[in-house]
Amino acid sequence: MRVILLLAFLISLTECQWTSEDLALYDLVEEVGVNFYEWFDIPRDASSNQVKKAYRKLTLEWHPDRNSAPDATEKFRQVAGIYEVLKTTELREKYDNVLENGLPSWRHPMYYYRRMRKLAWYEGILVLLFIGTIAHYLMMWAAYFEKTLVYKQNVKKSRKSKKEDPAEAEKLMKQALEEYLPKYSELLPIILARGTVTLFKNLALTAKDAMTPKEVEPEEPTEEELAQQRRQQRAAAAPQQLEFKFEVAQGMKAVSTNDPEMEKKYAAENEVVAQKQSGATWTPDELASLVRLSTEKYPAGTPNRWEQMGRVLNRSAEDVIAMAGKMKQMKQEDYTKLLMTTIQQSVPVEEKSEDDWSQAEQKAFETALQKYPKGTDERWERISEEIGSKTKKQVMVRFKQLAEMIRKKKTNDT
């Protein structure tokens, strides 16, 4: 490559030294092949008028309309070119110099430049590649001999200091020089071909990657967002105390129905219940049912409210009214403790799902996210190993869930 650049630099210097008129003059002299003055039949010191007369005579002789010779057109063009040289004092002096000294020889850069100008672009590339290959091959041998001299000097120094065995040092030197020995696989055309193939492969892979839709990885949550997520999880995991609101009628009698048959039925049921349950102790289940019935199923204003609640509880309306009044006077803390056992027994315990994360697992997950940032090879496998109790799939699902929750929160905030 350095050789090719050097040749291009020399060619540019050559082009700057000679003008296009000089190059055209050299090409014309080489093409005509005869003395311009002899062809025009004039002396070397002929005047401009003599040159014009000779030019008119030759144009009439070689004009394609007057001369039917096959080379008439070519001769007519050469006559016009010679006239352009001889009529100009500067070009005429340069032509006289060519007559005395001749055209640039092979020792001169102009010789090669003039021939390069006549080649096609691909021919010029082949010539430069050939020259560059030879120069590159010679430079590889020069580098090899340079390394040889350096190693030989080191061997001599080791012999003088007696640090190494001479035979062993010679063997090591040969092994080291094998790396610098010129090889045909390192010639310039092979290097260029190999580089071109590698370039096209990389371009194909780049184009394939650009056309393949990539899965957008969600943004990683920040420390503040993770801390807020932990607080929300702890709040959701903490047992919540149920707040019971109830109303008890005071100074009122039970509402009775206007249906006589229903009144008789309710009266008979009340008597049975009163005989069976009057004065019995209320269980926590009955207390919970009483609160639920008084607030949800039979709220204030329901006809025959206390009688209907008594039928459900198998107690008389008076017992229901009395207990409701007592519960209204109880403190909220005592009331909550009284019902806590029943509530815990009534609520089914959910089995822990595989997707549930404990606080320890969540903390290990956040620590692993910081330890293996985005772009780490096999990131999700390493994070899964750090947690220990979660698979790669569960880790990825958890990450997407957190990112989605944070994204929704940002959207709601805005």
Curated annotation (Swiss-Prot):
Cellular location(s): Nucleus membrane
Domain J: 35-99
Keyword Hydrolase included in the entry's annotation: no
Domain of life: Eukaryota
Location of region: Disordered: 211-234
Segment forming the signal sequence: 1-16
InterPro entries: DnaJ_domain (IPR001623), DnaJ_domain_protein (IPR052606), Homeodomain-like_sf (IPR009057), J_dom_sf (IPR036869), SANT/Myb (IPR001005), SANT_dom (IPR017884)
Coiled-coil segments: none
Any GO molecular function: DNA binding
Organism: Caenorhabditis elegans
Protein name: Uncharacterized protein F54F2.9
